[in-house]
UniProtKB/Swiss-Prot annotation:
GO molecular function terms noted in the UniProt entry: glutamate-1-semialdehyde 2,1-aminomutase activity; pyridoxal phosphate binding; transaminase activity
Family assignment from sequence similarity: Belongs to the class-III pyridoxal-phosphate-dependent aminotransferase family. HemL subfamily.
InterPro entries: 4pyrrol_synth_GluAld_NH2Trfase, Aminotrans_3, Aminotrans_3_PPA_site, PyrdxlP-dep_Trfase, PyrdxlP-dep_Trfase_major, PyrdxlP-dep_Trfase_small
Signal peptide: none
Gene: hemL
Regions annotated as coiled coil: none
Chief location bin: cytoplasm
Name of the featured protein: Glutamate-1-semialdehyde 2,1-aminomutase
Record's keyword annotation contains Isomerase: yes
Amino acid sequence: MVTTALNTTKSEEIFSAAQKLMPGGVSSPVRAFKSVGGQPIVFDRVKGSRVWDVDGNEYIDYVGTWGPAICGHANDEVNAALRETLEKGTSFGAPCLKENILAEMVINAVPSIEMVRFVNSGTEACMSVLRLMRAFTGREKIIKFEGCYHGHADMFLVQAGSGVATLGLPDSPGVPKTTTAATLTAPYNDLEAVKKLFAENPGEIAGVILEPVVGNSGFVLPDAGFLEGLREITKEHDALLVFDEVMTGFRISYGGAQEKFGVTPDLTTLGKVIGGGLPVGAYGGRKDIMSMVAPAGPMYQAGTLSGNPLAMTAGIKTLELLQRPGMYGQLETITKKLIDGLLSIAREAGHEVTGGNISGMFGMFFTGEPVRNYEDAKKSDLHKFSRYHRGMLEQGIYLAPSQFEAGFTSLAHTDEDIEKTLAAAKVVLNNL
């Protein structure tokens, strides 16, 4: 059973059958609930801030399909736009006007992006941007940070976060050593470690890629001066700075983390929010760099479904909604109320916790020590988190089934949702 209080018979039956059809019974590892125990619930439908499972149980959702549902699930305006586009076709395999519209919106919003290429996922965006980094600089080595996740491509599965961290894996079998030999790693928030890597590899490093706000080791903020320091170091060594804003883009501010912190990278990857719930990714940056991408330049990258009209439509409408006055203030207010309440309740119940938020992105660790990087995140009491997760599920609150994933609010969450969540947390944390 997933819980003791909920009837999840149908979820169990479906998941049992799924395990005979798909590896682990899921299409993405974290969904299997391995780090929190029990079997996953199977969703039937979603709307606004709520999700319903196949047994009819209703939950307040703080996963938001892992970030894209910033306007709430099945937003009426997004759905209406999709229905209109659907009548014209789902995929053209040729240019469409909606690509221009979304591209212009992205370019106008994100400080670093002068040109953009649409792809089908965040993983694809990061794979492509790595190839571009190497093509532009003529160098092969890159620096990534421990616990930062940039998708499941071979060259990034070194000290990765997200599902890799959830399963307790340092990397993955099947990745050739030669593929990751050029991937250097440093602890997040450690500028001295980055300087050391540049000193040890003079003229060989193409650039640095990172999540400007980490969401795949749990929620970890950059120290004051960290992003600025990376910008200075990369400029000093004629290397590129790349922000993986698949998670933070259009979520923590309309212009992403780079707008929020005032640090402009050379290249940026995007996903999640810009697809409005449909599969999408993008990478973009300075025009002189992006001009190397085929067919304008020699660096090849392509995709059958890239820029398809449905994904473009959902992205356009989502960004239009986010442009309305007060949207990000609303996200900040409601998310701060949530995380401040959770931390207060946990501490009053005698638990050592730390956490925070930035706009509609938040996290809480079961440790009293500050969390500045992946090693700090691993000090969280994972057994306690798993019991907390199961308890909240019983109370009708759906949280990410991993300590190493950030949580998300949406514009559909209400004060009543937050109050119900905090009331549930009080019950769970006082009995943990």
